[in-house]
């Protein structure tokens, strides 16, 4: 019997969290003698679906993985792709996302199917409590969310809105979990006429990379007085 073959599909290779997941997987694979392949979908749900299906549909069984572990890019956890994998006897693991089809696919009894995730709503609540502690008298929070179609981003925003006090006002921007995407979003926001009179008391982001991107965008402001106003 040969080594287990595992395919991991991650969203992007320019996000610290995704890179750390890849590093952890490589270390575990080396430790346990697993043949590991990692692919990235460049934050494109169609690309991710196509990449995984191509592997599932390999003619030779030896070219197919024994298991697929993936973090979904889009709003769904690729139910049709999941079914195709399980029908081929390939184990299916969803990272950081709920997937309502899991009980049904488990019932087929053809391959293991499960989810590894965290409580994203609770993460949003905790962040709301942190913001409230930092701004006990209230204020304006520049809040950088993940992609609109991403359920983790939606759940974190839901938790934030549930728990934040009424005296905290959120100014919402959208990113793609990366420094560059957050930087672009803030650059565009700073160009708006309405932004000139805006006062920000706190910056909050749904991941560390986007928080860094926000700061970098403020550091680019050419006017020293304005730059210090945003950074102070």
Cite the ranges covered by each PLM segment.
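A residue-level marker of the well-folded mature domains of exported/periplasmic proteins
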Residues: 1-232
């Amino acid at each position: 019997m040969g080594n287990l073959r595992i395919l991991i599909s991650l969203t992007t290779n320019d996000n610290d969290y995704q890179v750390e997941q890849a590093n952890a997987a490589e270390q575990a694979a080396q430790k346990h003698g697993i043949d590991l392949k990692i692919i990235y979908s460049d934050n494109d749900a169609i690309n991710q679906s196509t990449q995984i299906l191509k592997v599932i549909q390999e003619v030779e069984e030896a070219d197919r993985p024994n298991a697929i572990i993936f973090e979904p890019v889009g709003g769904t956890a690729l139910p049709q792709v999941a079914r195709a994998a399980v029908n081929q006897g390939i184990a299916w693991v969803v990272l950081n996302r709920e997937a309502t089809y899991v009980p049904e696919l488990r019932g087929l009894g053809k391959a293991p199917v499960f989810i590894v995730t965290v409580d994203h709503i609770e993460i949003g609540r905790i962040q709301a409590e942190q913001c409230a502690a930092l701004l006990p008298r209230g204020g304006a929070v520049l809040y950088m969310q993940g992609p609109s179609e991403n359920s983790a981003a939606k759940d974190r925003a839901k938790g934030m809105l549930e728990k934040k006090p009424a005296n905290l006002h959120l100014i919402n921007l959208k990113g793609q979990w990366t420094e560059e995407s957050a930087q672009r979003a803030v650059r565009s926001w700073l160009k708006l006429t309405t932004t000139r009179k805006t006062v920000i008391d706190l910056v909050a982001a749904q991941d560390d990379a986007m928080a860094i991107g926000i700061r970098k965008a403020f550091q680019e402001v050419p006017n020293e007085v304005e730059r210090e106003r945003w950074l102070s």
